[in-house]
Amino acid sequence: MKRVSIIGTVGVPANYGGFESLVENIIGYNSPADIHYTVYCSAKSYPHRQSVYKNADLKYVPLDANGSQSILYDIVSLIKATKKSDVILILGVSGCCFLPIYRLFSKKRLVINIDGLEHRREKWGKYAKAFLKFSEKMAVKYADAVIADNKGIQDYVREEYGKEAELIAYGGDHV
C-alpha cells in the first residue's frame, strides 16, 4: 500500500478554503484502495480533533497554518510526514524554503502544488514577496512533480523555471 501524506493545508474536515476542499476530494472521492492518506492539520484550527476522517489519518501540528507561522507549520509537517510516507503532497510554497536542507537527508517523492503566484499579490510587502519568490523557486527546483491548478500557472512554471508542471484544474473531483 502506498502511503501519501498531505501537508500545507489548515486540515480536514474543510472549514477554510480551496486547498482544504481539494484534500476533501482527494481523500474521499474515488480514493484508490491501495493508497493510505495522512493529512497534517493545524491543531489551533481544530479544538475537537478526530484521528481519522474519510479513512485518512489526521495528525495535528500545534501551529497556525496561515500567517507567519505557516512557514514553520509546513516545515514541521514535512519532517513529521517523512517518517510515515512514500509520497508527500505539499500544498503551497511557504515551507519550501527548507527543501534544500530537507533533500540532504531525504529522497522522499515530493509533489508540490505551487498554488497561485503569491509573490505578486499586493497584500504582501517587499520582503514577504522576495521570500515567497525564493520559496517558489525552491519548490520547483526540489519537487519530483509540480502541480499547476490552471494553464496560466503551468505556462508560468515552464517560462520561469524551464520545468513542466502537471495541470490539474480545481475542483479536484477528478484527481
Question: Residues of each region from the PLM?
Answer:
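N-terminal strand-loop element at the rim of the active site
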Residues: 2, 9-15, 28-66, 152-160
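Short amphipathic alpha-helix
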Residues: 18-30, 77
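A short, charged, and often flexible helix/loop element on the N-terminal side
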Residues: 53-79, 122-128
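A short, histidine- and acid-enriched strand-loop-helix "catalytic/donor-clamping" loop
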Residues: 66-68, 97, 111-128, 142-145, ...
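An aromatic- and histidine-rich active-site surface loop
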Residues: 69-82, 86-115
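Membrane-proximal helix-turn-helix segments that form the acceptor-binding/catalytic region
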Residues: 79-82, 104, 128-146
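Donor nucleotide-sugar binding/catalytic pocket of nucleotide-sugar-dependent glycosyltransferases
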Residues: 109-112, 137-175
